[in-house]
């Protein structure tokens, strides 16, 4: 072999080696470590100060989500818990940048960036909920006093008990049910909690929050302060002087955002939410508002379904534009919805700038979510008042056009029974869905609301339609009543 050819081969091999190393290099490694530390800080902070769990419980349950990536143990590790100031810091040194999460009244825990001055925590937002009255002694559903009543004889006790056992006694340890609550005709017919939890325990809703956000937005649409088919009325980023008008993103409507069909560049797909995108707002102290507005349009809006936390936050930011001041915006979820339903154990979290992260960060308990589901079962009526229109409920229950490739399983920030399951479970059911198994399932045909809260982890997720299949065996249809 001529020397020059050998040299070419060696040179080519060197180039391929460099390219291979480049392909294997994780350009987001720093972000991933930062976000992992933030996940542990936020879940620990909320576990301790929002859910009032012990540090042992937090490590065994809340932090099971991190698996082997968790830093330390319940007894020690590279983290700090300040119980007086109510914050948790995680990481530092070889464990990556230290991230803090700080509990704030009326909100829960707010994550701050690594360079945050921890002597400045008083600058972080709070929401004053001291105006609330104690509703716990009121009768259900506005309060927590439940008068025992005989079970409807048409309900199968054995089937209901079997469904309860099915939900709690899972074959995989990765499926941990912490509460199960079933309403029939508005009355609690089943309520059970795992050890260490009770009806007051608040846990994270994850993406079940999206359905709450959609409800608040629907109130504004009903009031004609927002319109489903109007462009999102805010400025896109980056701000460029003399940008040609109109910005192509002005074609995105509220309907597109609620349908997960904005057409914007996806930043949360394929696990990237733990490297970039919304993960930086959830877990690392970035602005949720700036991130969701700083994406380019890559598809025609409404033509492609892609599950993006930032699409929800587009709609939430449109909601914010209807308020004249920050105080009214921050009290709106409580005064418009939570207080009116008796959901007084519910906290909606914000980023450090005061913007609600309604794509994921709400802390509440099973009973409050049951009240939320009951509002929808009652066609938006509550205590004689129409809080949300039937038209809005029809919208959230109608498949997003671009979801047809998925079996028409997604509406307006609510999940629908996919085509492939409609012969197994009531086809009119619709559900919230949050990471780690947070479900509120509304079944009009059977007068049912089913709430399942979980602290699942790993890859063997709990299936809400399987749960519905088991529970509905115990109940007659509304038509038969």
Specify the residue positions occupied by each region the protein language model found.
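Bacterial N-terminal signal peptides
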Residues: 9-18
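Structured C-terminal helix/loop/strand segments within mature extracytoplasmic catalytic/sensor domains
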Residues: 31, 115-118, 124-125, 432-481
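Beta-lactamase-like hydrolase cores
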Residues: 143-185
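Active-site SXXK
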Residues: 186, 204-229, 257, 315-319, ...
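Active-site-proximal alpha-helical segments within enzyme catalytic domains
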Residues: 214, 311-320, 360-382, 438-454
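Active-site helix/loop module of the DD-peptidase/beta-lactamase fold
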Residues: 223-264, 294-298, 324-360, 364
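Structural helix-adjacent loops and short alpha-helical linkers that scaffold large soluble proteins
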Residues: 224-228, 320-334, 380-388, 404-405, ...
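Active-site Gly/Thr loop motif
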Residues: 343-350, 393-449
């Amino acid at each position: 072999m001529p020397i020059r050819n050998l040299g070419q081969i060696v040179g080519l091999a060197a180039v391929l080696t460099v390219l291979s190393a480049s392909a294997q290099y994780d350009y987001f490694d720093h972000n991933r470590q930062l976000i992992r530390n933030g996940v542990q800080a936020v879940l620990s902070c909320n576990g301790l100060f929002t859910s009032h769990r012990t540090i042992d419980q937090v490590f065994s349950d809340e932090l099971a989500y991190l698996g082997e990536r968790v830093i330390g143990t319940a007894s020690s590790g590279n983290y700090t818990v300040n119980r007086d100031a109510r914050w948790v810091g995680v990481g530092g040194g070889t464990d990556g940048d230290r991230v803090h999460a700080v509990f704030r009244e009326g909100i829960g825990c707010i994550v701050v960036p690594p360079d945050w001055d921890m002597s400045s925590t008083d600058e972080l937002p709070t929401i004053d909920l001291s105006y609330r009255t104690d509703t716990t002694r009121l009768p259900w559903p506005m309060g927590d006093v439940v008068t025992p009543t005989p079970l409807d004889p048409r309900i199968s006790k054995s089937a209901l008990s079997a469904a309860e056992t099915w939900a709690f006694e899972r074959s995989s340890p990765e499926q941990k049910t912490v509460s199960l609550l079933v309403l029939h005709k508005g009355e609690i017919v089943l309520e059970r909690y795992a050890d260490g939890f009770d009806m007051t325990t608040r846990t994270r809703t994850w993406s079940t929050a999206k359905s709450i956000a959609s409800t608040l937005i629907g109130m504004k649409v009903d009031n004609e302060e927002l319109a489903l088919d109007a462009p999102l009325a805010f400025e896109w980023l980056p701000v460029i002087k003399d940008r040609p008008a109109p910005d192509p993103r002005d074609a995105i409507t509220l309907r597109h955002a609620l349908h997960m069909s904005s057409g914007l560049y996806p930043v949360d797909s394929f696990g990237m939410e733990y490297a970039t995108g919304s993960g930086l707002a959830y877990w690392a102290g970035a602005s949720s508002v700036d991130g969701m507005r700083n994406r380019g349009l890559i598809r025609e809006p409404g033509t492609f379904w892609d599950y993006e936390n930032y699409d929800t936050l587009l709609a939430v930011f449109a909601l914010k534009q209807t308020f004249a001041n920050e105080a009214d915006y921050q009290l709106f979820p409580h005064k418009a919805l939570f207080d009116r339903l008796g959901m007084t154990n519910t906290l909606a979290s914000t980023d450090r700038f005061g913007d609600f992260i309604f794509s994921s960060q709400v802390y509440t308990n099973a009973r409050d979510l049951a009240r939320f589901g009951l509002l929808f079962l009652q066609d938006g009526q509550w205590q004689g008042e129409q809080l949300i229109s039937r038209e809005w409920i029809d919208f959230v229950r109608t498949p997003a056009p671009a979801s047809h490739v998925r079996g028409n399983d997604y509406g307006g920030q609510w999940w629908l029974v996919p085509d492939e399951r409609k012969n197994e479970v009531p086809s009119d059911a619709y559900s919230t869905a949050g990471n780690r198994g947070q479900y509120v399932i509304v079944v009009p045909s059977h007068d049912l609301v089913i709430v399942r809260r979980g602290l699942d982890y790993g890859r063997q997720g709990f299936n809400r339609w399987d749960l519905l299949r088991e529970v509905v065996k115990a109940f007659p249809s509304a038509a038969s009543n």
